[in-house]
């Protein structure tokens, strides 16, 4: 009788030990259970002395109008959906992927890169920055905008990724002043620019 009791007690303990779904002590997580979802920030517009007319993301410092980004984790690059709301003026966004997302494999920080725009024919490569020489047309200005977050650490408990512009927005306003009654015919050149 005692042997049967101890055998049942041992069986009950072993079954109870197998029902825990908690991660192991080494920070590992169950495979395929924790999709990578990231809060994207950054894109602030610096030094804007006057209210400029709004164009579209990201040149105005917000995520409005950006629908997807390329997100690289390890060697794999996947297209992630951008969800932004006006609750914070579109200043932050959630990057997520419904089907086949990247997954956390542990609670340790991960290193990711992300960029927009990207070439759908080859999403694996961050495109070279190409800006229109003449950006006086709105479409040329907008198509010269590139944002990225390169090789950034993302924490499991606070998955935030700060993006920055890969290009600079420069606005030059010419005004007549002392010795100049008109700026008609003036030419402006920016020199010594680099990537």
Regions found by a protein language model. Name each.
Residues 2-11, 15-195:
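Sec-type signal peptide cleavage vicinity
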